Regions:
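Short, low-complexity N-terminal intrinsically disordered segments enriched in polar/charged residues
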Residues: 1-42, 46, 50, 54-55
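Short beta-strand edge/turn micro-motifs at domain boundaries
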Residues: 5, 120-124, 145-178
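A solvent-exposed, acidic/Ser-Thr-rich amphipathic alpha-helical stretch
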Residues: 49-129
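Extracellular/periplasmic carbohydrate-active domains that bind, remodel
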Residues: 87-95, 126-136, 147, 183-185, ...
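Short aromatic-glycine motifs in intrinsically disordered, low-complexity regions
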Residues: 96-99, 136-141, 153
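Short, surface-exposed coil-to-beta transition loops
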Residues: 105-107, 142-148
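Short, cysteine-centered beta-strand-loop-beta hairpins and adjacent loop/turn segments enriched
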Residues: 130-142, 170-172
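A hydrophobic membrane-anchoring alpha-helix module
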Residues: 169-171, 178-221
Length: 221
């Protein structure tokens, strides 16, 4: 075998290994982001605020927007938005919501796109919801669904939230259903005012299509 042929084959092998390493890293990144989202969902059940806040980057440009509670900009504002007014100390000493509070929000149907540099990513999920929350001073059994469009940043090899945007489709009393009562409002708490108004807050039956971060995977449009 000529040395030129050997060099060519070695180069092809090196290029192939590099491509496979990049593809493997993307697979690992997608799995890590899915784990981040699922962890967030579990922490929301009893509103474990320290765990929730720990999922975020400390950057100044982080943002949180949850339907009609407003838009929060900057780490300090985002962290404060997750602080529950009436803390309950759980059996393990953690700060949580009171025992009757229930907020099960399950991420599903995720579509994640990692940027070529592997440092940032975007993702979209449905959030299926069952809860026991106070609305109008009463504890209500609620059923709901919404959509997340989130942005993530990789810091020190760890994926964290950069922007979290959740648009409720329905949040309805279980005994009434979403056709009768599509949404029970949940305005921001007085002690946690947002940085600004919502940019997306459209519920059923508006027909609103929450903007996609990605193009059609077949047509590219």
């Amino acid at each position: 075998m000529k040395s030129e042929d050997l060099e060519t084959k070695v180069k092809i092998l090196k290029d192939t290994v590099k491509k496979l390493e990049t593809r493997l890293q993307t697979v690992e990144d997608v799995e890590a982001i899915n784990k981040l989202m699922n962890a967030y969902g579990y922490y929301l059940e009893h509103w474990q605020e320290d765990q929730i806040i720990g999922l975020w980057s400390h950057r100044d440009d982080v943002e949180l927007e949850i339907h009609d509670t407003g838009l929060y900009k900057g780490y300090e504002a985002v962290a404060k938005s997750f602080q529950f007014k009436d803390h309950y100390t759980a059996f393990n000493g953690e700060k949580t919501a009171p025992p009757e509070y229930l907020h099960i929000l399950i991420p599903n149907a995720g579509i994640i796109d990692v940027e070529p540099d592997g440092k940032t990513a975007k993702g979209r999920w449905y959030g299926s919801f069952l809860g026991a929350l106070r609305r109008g001073g009463k504890l209500r059994a609620l059923i709901g669904c919404g959509i997340w469009e989130n942005e993530f940043v990789k810091e020190g090899g760890i994926w964290k939230f950069k922007k979290l945007l959740f648009n409720d489709i329905i949040s309805s009393p279980l005994d009434e259903g979403w056709v009768k009562t599509p949404y029970l409002a949940n305005p921001p708490a007085n002690d946690r005012p947002p940085s600004g108004p919502n940019t997306h807050a459209q519920t059923y039956p508006s027909g609103y299509i929450f903007p996609y971060h990605y193009k059609n995977p077949v047509t590219g449009k």
